[in-house]
Amino acid sequence: MAEISPHARCLACAFPFWEQLTPEEQERLCRFTRPVHYAKGARVHSPLESCVGILLLRSGQLRSYLLSEDGRDVTLYRLFGGEVCILSASCVMDAVNIDLYIDAEEDTEALCISAGIFRQLMQENVYVRCYAYQMTAERFSDTMWTMQQILFMSADRRLAIFLTDELAKTGGTDLRMTHDQMAKYMGAAREVVSRMLKYFAQEGWVRLYRGGVQVLDKKKLQALARGE
């Protein structure tokens, strides 16, 4: 495959529909793709801003969340390098109407695809359209899982799920994260998270240290996460 632009290889790897595009569609997608950088803490998307576009993360981390009128937020999901943020271009999905906020949790490098061009490709190419709806369904599945935990699960089980999920990403036993960060990502009060961590430490499941947690008994946490 001849390289159409410096971004063609990244787009080809990220999007399963790439080979189903015509050469003209591939060229158009590349032409309206640009590199973007978001500093840690930067606002990427909000309901008050225009449609950002589809983001293909190359490095860093984005957090998607809802914000209440009194300033309380609930983290819905996080995205990491290699993942695609489609709800930053929710304007291309006529059936999606959600007041979503997206912030950069770390310095983030990404490729941004024009929302208008992506909408055109969705209308022209059934493979692009199917991909967009599949990705949107996956993000809403993540959102429903988060809401299910908040509404129906006990605090200790939610914390066990969070710890096991985070460690699964790294394959280690240490999680370098403050109690405030854990509470933010879980949609819980900091006091609740601190109390549960202290309980886990008393049981010998974790060791607490400044700025992090070391898991000592992963099997116990996994059993609690499963509701056993």
Please place each PLM-identified region on the residue numbering.
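Polybasic "coupling" helices that flank or enter modular domains
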Residues: 105-107, 123-188
